[in-house]
């Protein structure tokens, strides 16, 4: 089995139009939080995968900066790859909980084999009066 992430993003909203085109809105890599634990109400993970022809099982896991899994029930998606076409995977993630600062990774596996990851950094929000000034 071979597979790769050809395009991947975390965003506020994702959809596939009738023509098969993927639209992403509000792409981000950082989430600013006032403190921990923090909860992000809604986000979408979008990945365009290049896969071998046939049926596949895609699993999305959230890994903390220490490498430990953070999602108790990772989403599993069954997909079918057709010759000459990429596979669009869109996962809606609601009420994601973060208990540590740092770079987390959404790891994608296809049929049990890691094909790549999408990073998201959880950073502490600075109070308005403490913003850094450029020199």
Predicted regions and their residues:
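Contiguous segments within soluble domain cores/interaction surfaces
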Residues: 2-135
């Amino acid at each position: 089995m071979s597979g790769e992430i050809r395009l991947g993003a975390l965003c506020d909203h994702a959809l596939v139009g009738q023509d098969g085109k993927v639209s992403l809105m509000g792409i981000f890599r950082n989430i600013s939080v006032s403190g921990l634990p923090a909860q992000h109400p809604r986000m979408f993970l979008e990945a365009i995968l290049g896969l071998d022809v046939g049926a596949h099982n895609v699993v999305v896991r959230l890994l903390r900066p220490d490498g430990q899994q953070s999602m108790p029930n990772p989403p599993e998606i069954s997909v079918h790859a057709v010759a000459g076409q990429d596979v669009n995977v869109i996962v809606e993630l609601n009420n994601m909980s973060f208990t540590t600062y740092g770079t987390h990774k959404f790891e994608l596996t296809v049929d049990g084999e890691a094909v790549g990851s999408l990073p998201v950094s959880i950073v502490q929000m600075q109070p308005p009066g403490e913003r850094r000034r450029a020199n």
